[in-house]
From Swiss-Prot:
This is Serine protease inhibitor Kazal-type 13. Disulfide bonds join C42-C78, C56-C75, C64-C96. Its main location: secreted. It is found in: Secreted.
Length: 97
């Protein structure tokens, strides 16, 4: 009886480890389609007072715009769009090439 219980435990452990390995490595290998992500919510970053100095977070989550610039994150992109006009459009998340 002990041998069959040990065999079942090994089989269960093997299945759990194989499943965990598959999930982990498939997430690493899978390409991320940034075009399917939603556009930045710029209204969230627009200052209420025009004299207000924007305080964007120091986070690297690059945004590429139609002006060819890569912004550090969506906050910097949205503030530039607010200051310089709607002709600056969102292209994709990630660096411009």
């Amino acid at each position: 009886m002990k041998r069959s219980g040990c065999w079942h435990q090994r089989m269960l452990l093997s299945l759990v480890l194989l499943t965990w390995t598959h999930v982990t490595f498939s997430a690493l290998i899978r390409s991320h389609n940034f075009s399917r992500w939603p556009k930045p919510p710029c209204k969230m970053y627009y200052p209420i007072d025009p004299d207000y100095e924007a305080n964007c977070p120091d986070v690297k989550a690059y945004v590429c715009a139609t002006n060819g610039l890569t912004y550090k994150n969506e906050c910097f992109f949205c503030i530039d769009r607010w200051e310089f006009g709607p002709h600056i459009q969102f292209v994709k998340y990630g660096k411009c090439e």
